[in-house]
């Protein structure tokens, strides 16, 4: 059974800051010059009263009538704290753990009028959670005939006073979503793959960077092997937003044209936790640069350590 993905949408934190402003405010570890050299210009930070449920609702409502056919929501969060919007202070006062189970997916269901939907929460996959959600949605549609369209959504915000830099990448709060369906529209989901190395769960920034190239190269080769393909079958790589030099190196390792590695949203939005692939997919698709039949490889690395991929084909 073929499964498709369509309607990528996203939203960002309330306030945009330039790298100079955030460096001066100690929101970053690297200097503004270093961040600019890596390709970053601005990032987006939520106001204190904006929660992940707000980011998710802002994103999902952009889908309009597409929500009418959604039967299941797969809601992924990178930070475990974003898996509940309840008050820890209320728990401490009452000692009642219900305050720790105020799930943003349930809030989203109510806010968007998705009364008859099933809810699945996905975490412990860090920045790869969105691609993991797409993989799960594909498997559900192929395994359960009574499941209709699936909303895959991710939303995360850093806590107040957090450092908005990880592994030398400038972070933005934000959310992103796609609809996964049996209806032929947008892109066919050709294949999905995941690698996890739990021994690296507490990897430092330098260790994360050091393992990135080896594991991402392995991820690409194993992903292509699963669909009996080679790198020459891929027309575009839809990348995560990270240091531009890293992608130049990786493209050479993969023997892939670096001009076909797309992460043009990087200067404007930074690294939007689990949302980069969706944001870049939307921007590239909106440009009409993708031709029917072309294959796209979406890649993401995340703490845990996790690496995930999704291969798409434009319909």
PLM features: residue spans?
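Condensing-enzyme catalytic core mediating Claisen C-C bond formation in acyl metabolism
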Residues: 1-49, 162-222, 226, 301, ...
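Conserved catalytic cysteine-centered active-site region
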Residues: 28, 32-53, 80-136, 140-148, ...
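Flexible, glycine-rich active-site loops centered on histidine and acidic residues
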Residues: 142, 147, 153-174
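Acidic, glycine-rich active-site loops and adjacent beta-strand->loop/helix elements
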Residues: 76-81, 124-128, 154-159, 300-305
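Glycine-rich phosphate-binding loops at beta-strand->alpha-helix junctions
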Residues: 237-246, 269-272
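Catalytic phosphate/nucleotide-handling subdomain of diverse soluble enzymes
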Residues: 284-292, 311-315
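Conserved beta-strand elements of the Class I
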Residues: 4, 71-74, 149-151, 235, ...
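Phosphate/pyrophosphate-binding loops at sites that engage ATP/ADP/AMP, CoA/4′-phosphopantetheine
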Residues: 56-71, 218-235, 254, 284-289
């Amino acid at each position: 059974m073929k499964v498709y993905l369509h309607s990528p949408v996203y939203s960002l934190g309330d306030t945009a800051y330039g790298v100079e402003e955030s460096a001066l405010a100690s929101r970053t570890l690297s200097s503004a010059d270093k961040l600019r050299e890596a390709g970053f210009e601005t990032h987006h930070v939520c106001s204190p009263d904006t929660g992940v449920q707000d980011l998710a609702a802002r994103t999902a409502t952009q889908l309009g009538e597409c929500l009418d056919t959604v039967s299941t929501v797969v809601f992924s969060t990178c930070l475990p704290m974003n898996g509940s919007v309840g008050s820890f202070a209320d728990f401490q006062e009452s000692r009642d753990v219900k305050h720790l189970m105020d799930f943003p997916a349930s809030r989203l269901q109510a806010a968007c009028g998705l009364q008859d939907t099933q809810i699945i929460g996905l975490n412990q996959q860090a920045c790869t959670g969105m691609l993991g959600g797409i993989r799960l949605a594909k498997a559900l549609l192929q395994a359960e005939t009574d499941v209709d369209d699936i909303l895959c959504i991710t939303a995360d915000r850093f806590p107040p006073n957090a450092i908005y830099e990880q592994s030398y990448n400038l972070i933005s709060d934000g959310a992103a979503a796609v609809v996964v369906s049996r209806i032929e529209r947008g892109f066919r989901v050709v294949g999905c793959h995941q690698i996890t190395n739990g021994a690296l769960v507490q990897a430092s920034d330098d260790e994360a960077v050091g393992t990135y190239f080896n594991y991402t190269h392995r991820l690409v080769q194993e992903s292509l092997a699963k669909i009996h393909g080679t790198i020459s079958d891929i027309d575009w790589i839809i990348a995560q937003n990270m240091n531009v030099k890293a992608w130049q190196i990786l493209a050479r390792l993969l023997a892939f044209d670096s001009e076909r590695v797309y992460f043009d949203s990087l200067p404007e939005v930074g690294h939007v936790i689990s949302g980069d692939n969706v944001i870049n997919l939307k921007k590239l698709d909106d440009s009409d640069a993708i031709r029917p039949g072309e294959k796209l490889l979406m890649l993401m690395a995340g703490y845990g350590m996790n690496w995930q991929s999704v291969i798409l084909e434009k319909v």
